[in-house]
Amino acid sequence: MKFPKRYAIVLLTFMCTNVCYIERVGFSIAYTVAADAVGTNQANKGMILSMFYYGYVLSQIPGGWAAQRLGGRLVLLLSFVLWSSICAVVPLDPNRVILLVLSRLLVGVAQGLIFPSIHTVLAQWVPPQERSRSVSLTTSGMYLGAACGMLLLPSLVKNMGPQSVFSVEAMLGVAWLLIWFKFASDPPRTDLPKVASKDKMKVQTGGIMAPRTVKIPWARILFSLPIWAIVVNNFTFHYALYVLMNWLPTYFKLGLQLSLQDMGFSKMLPYLNMFLFSNIGGVLADHLITRKILSVTKTRKLLNTVGFVVSAIALMALPLFRTPSGAIFCSSVSLGFLALGRAGFAVNHMDVAPKFAGIVMGISNTAGTLAGIVGVGLTGRILEAAKASNMDLTSSESWRTVFFVPGYLCIFSSFIFLIFSTGEKIFE
C-alpha cells in the first residue's frame, strides 16, 4: 500500500518542530551554564534568554504572508538555512553580549517563520477529519524535542562544554533541511485544467482551494472575537511554557539546590508528558468530532478548559512542593495539561479560517511570542527584586509570583475561550 503524501508531510513537520525545540532548550541549558560560570546576574540572563522572542515576534505575520505567497516548503527551507548557519558560526561567550543579542534575534526571526509555514502546509494537505491529530502530532514534536534536549544536552555540556550544543544543533538543522528538500513538495495547485484533477485536489486538501493570490480579509480577521479568543489563549500558553522552559533549570539549581546533570531521566518528564498529552488531545478531539459525540465548538471548548484549568492548579502548587519529585510532578502535570489544551485553541484557527490558517497562526503566534518577551524577561526581574528585598532564592516565597502569574492567566484565558470561541467556519 502506498504511503499517502500527507502522512509524509505531517511526519516531516513533526521532525521540524522536534529539532527547533532541541535548539531552544539547548540554548537555555548551555547559556545558563556559561553565564553562571562568569557570574551573570538573573536580570541579564533573562534579557539574553528573551532576545530570541524579540526576533521571533518580528517574523510571525510576515511568515504567514510569505507561506501564503511563496509556499510553506520554501519558507521552511530558508528558515533552517538561516538559524542552522548562525548556530554553526556564533561562539557562546556570555561576555560578548552584543554578539549574543544579535545572534539570538536572528535565530528568533528565522524560527518565527516556521509555525505559520507549517500551519499553511497542514491546512493545504490535511483533510478536516484528520486536522486535530495532525496538528497535535506536529506540535508534539516540540515537546519531544524539549524532552530529548533536557535528557541529553546537560551531559553534553558537562563533558564537551556549552559550545558543543551549538554544533550539534547546527548539524540537526542541516540534516532536517536536506530531508525536507528531498521529500517535501508544495500541495497540488488550484489551476489544474481538468475538473477531475480539481476533485482529486479537494480530497487531498480537505476542500481548501484558495489560490495564493487570494485577497486576505485583514480587517475581518483583526476584529473577530473568535480569533481574539485564540490569540489570548496562545499568549497564555506560551507565557507558561516559556517561563518553565527557560527558568525551570534555574529553579532546580537555585530553588531546590539540584543540578540538571544529577537528575537523570526525571528532568525530561515534563516535556515527555507534553508529548503524550498533546497526541492524546488530538486523537480525543478527532474521535469526539468524527463520531458526532460533540460538535466541533464544544470539543474545542471542553479540551481547552480542562487543559488550562488543571495546568493553572499545578502551576500554583509548584512552589509549594520543596522536593525534586514534587516539582517534577507539578511541572509535568502543568505542561501536560497545557498540551492537552492545544486540541482546543491551537487547532481552532483551522476550523474558523482554513484558507487563511497561516495568517491567523502568524497573528496568534505573535501574541505567543510577546508572551515569551514579557514572561522570560519579567521572571528575571521578579527574581532580582526578590534578591534586592533580601529574600532567599531557595525559599518558596521568592518563586511564588513566578508561577502564580501564569496560573492566573490560564484561568482567565479559559473563560475567554469558553465565551467567545467557535468551531464554525467564519472566513470563506
Swiss-Prot record:
<keyword id="KW-0732">Signal</keyword>
<dbReference type="InterPro" id="IPR036259">
    <property type="entry name" value="MFS_trans_sf"/>
</dbReference>
<dbReference type="GO" id="GO:0006811">
    <property type="term" value="P:monoatomic ion transport"/>
</dbReference>
<dbReference type="InterPro" id="IPR011701">
    <property type="entry name" value="MFS"/>
</dbReference>
<feature type="transmembrane region" description="Helical">
    <location>
        <begin position="47"/>
        <end position="67"/>
    </location>
</feature>
<feature type="signal peptide">
    <location>
        <begin position="1"/>
        <end position="22"/>
    </location>
</feature>
<feature type="transmembrane region" description="Helical">
    <location>
        <begin position="74"/>
        <end position="94"/>
    </location>
</feature>
<feature type="transmembrane region" description="Helical">
    <location>
        <begin position="221"/>
        <end position="241"/>
    </location>
</feature>
<keyword id="KW-1003">Cell membrane</keyword>
<feature type="transmembrane region" description="Helical">
    <location>
        <begin position="327"/>
        <end position="347"/>
    </location>
</feature>
<keyword id="KW-0472">Membrane</keyword>
<feature type="transmembrane region" description="Helical">
    <location>
        <begin position="164"/>
        <end position="184"/>
    </location>
</feature>
<dbReference type="InterPro" id="IPR044777">
    <property type="entry name" value="SLC17A9-like"/>
</dbReference>
<dbReference type="GO" id="GO:0005886">
    <property type="term" value="C:plasma membrane"/>
</dbReference>
<feature type="transmembrane region" description="Helical">
    <location>
        <begin position="401"/>
        <end position="421"/>
    </location>
</feature>
<feature type="transmembrane region" description="Helical">
    <location>
        <begin position="301"/>
        <end position="321"/>
    </location>
</feature>
<dbReference type="Pfam" id="PF07690">
    <property type="entry name" value="MFS_1"/>
</dbReference>
<comment type="function">
    <text>Probable anion transporter.</text>
</comment>
<dbReference type="InterPro" id="IPR020846">
    <property type="entry name" value="MFS_dom"/>
</dbReference>
<dbReference type="InterPro" id="IPR050382">
    <property type="entry name" value="MFS_Na/Anion_cotransporter"/>
</dbReference>
<protein>
    <recommendedName>
        <fullName>Probable anion transporter 6</fullName>
    </recommendedName>
</protein>
<comment type="similarity">
    <text>Belongs to the major facilitator superfamily. Sodium/anion cotransporter (TC 2.A.1.14) family.</text>
</comment>
<dbReference type="GO" id="GO:0005315">
    <property type="term" value="F:phosphate transmembrane transporter activity"/>
</dbReference>
<keyword id="KW-0812">Transmembrane</keyword>
<feature type="transmembrane region" description="Helical">
    <location>
        <begin position="356"/>
        <end position="376"/>
    </location>
</feature>
<feature type="transmembrane region" description="Helical">
    <location>
        <begin position="269"/>
        <end position="289"/>
    </location>
</feature>
<keyword id="KW-0813">Transport</keyword>
<keyword id="KW-0406">Ion transport</keyword>
<feature type="transmembrane region" description="Helical">
    <location>
        <begin position="137"/>
        <end position="157"/>
    </location>
</feature>
<feature type="transmembrane region" description="Helical">
    <location>
        <begin position="98"/>
        <end position="118"/>
    </location>
</feature>
<keyword id="KW-1133">Transmembrane helix</keyword>
